[in-house]
Amino acid sequence: MIELIPAIDIIDGKCVRLTQGDYATKKVYNEDPLEVAKMFEGNGIRRLHVVDLDGAREGRIINYRILERIATRTSLIIDFGGGLKQEDDLEIAFESGAQMVTGGSIAVKNPEMFTSWISKFGSEKIILGADAKEKKIAISGWEETTSQELVPFIKGYYDKGITKVICTDIARDGMLQGPAIDLYKEIRDEIPFLYIIASGGVSSIEDIEKLSEAGIPAVIFGKAIYEGKIQLKDLLRFT
């Protein structure tokens, strides 16, 4: 059964969504992310993906107080990303209640440090964030596209011990046009034992079913819930 991971993206302490990572498209869905997290938990959800978009842009963890509130007032298993640049940032995230953290930009800009995190904290706590625009890795809140190819980038870190990756096709993020199933299949075929968490484009229950049928173990979704394209009660069949 595919693992369901709703996303809460945070700017100025509020639950927001962007379209294709563009901060100018910010739309506030709820003033209180804790309220959203409790709603998910009340509908059988066990995992949560929390992104500090302020942190991603500033290069330092900012919204850890929100993380702490969600972690102490729900039982959700939280992975946290955005602005993780130093080991101190990870310590703050873990102390604030995250069970896992996601590193994206840091894995490109400072591979030695990211690799040291895998060694120190273990692959069960460190998730690779591999966000791609036309199969090229994008970083810094998706505002910069690199020349690194997606699949070799992931494979390199798999060889260094990474077991989980969140892969976002930026072109589909927030567009509600369906996930990049062929891309995830390509990664799965190249790295069969990798735990792939699909992200971006989910617009319906049918999209989740297609990912499940394709053998993708987990999916992150956000806008489809916030825009009412997916009803929380419809997710119960997967939980």
From Swiss-Prot:
Catalytic activity: 1-(5-phospho-beta-D-ribosyl)-5-[(5-phospho-beta-D-ribosylamino)methylideneamino]imidazole-4-carboxamide = 5-[(5-phospho-1-deoxy-D-ribulos-1-ylimino)methylamino]-1-(5-phospho-beta-D-ribosyl)imidazole-4-carboxamide
Entry EC no(s): 5.3.1.16
Transferase in keyword set: no
Cell location: Cytoplasm
Gene3D superfamilies for this protein: Aldolase class I
EC class: isomerase
Active site: D9 (proton acceptor), D131 (proton donor)
GO BP: any one term: L-tryptophan biosynthetic process
Pathway involvement of the protein, from the record: Amino-acid biosynthesis; L-histidine biosynthesis; L-histidine from 5-phospho-alpha-D-ribose 1-diphosphate: step 4/9
Chief subcellular location: cytoplasm
InterPro entries: Aldolase_TIM, His_biosynth, HisA_bact_arch, Isoase_HisA-like, Isoase_HisA-like_bact, RibuloseP-bd_barrel
Pfam family, one: His_biosynth
One CC-aspect GO term: cytoplasm
GO molecular function: 1-(5-phosphoribosyl)-5-[(5-phosphoribosylamino)methylideneamino]imidazole-4-carboxamide isomerase activity
Keywords: Amino-acid biosynthesis, Cytoplasm, Histidine biosynthesis, Isomerase
Protein's UniProt keywords contain Signal: no
NCBIfam families, sorted: 1-(5-phosphoribosyl)-5-[(5-phosphoribosylamino)methylideneamino]imidazole-4-carboxamide isomerase (TIGR00007)
The family this protein is said to belong to: Belongs to the HisA/HisF family.
Protein's name according to its UniProt entry: 1-(5-phosphoribosyl)-5-[(5-phosphoribosylamino)methylideneamino] imidazole-4-carboxamide isomerase
Source organism: Parabacteroides distasonis (strain ATCC 8503 / DSM 20701 / CIP 104284 / JCM 5825 / NCTC 11152)
Gene from which this protein is expressed: hisA
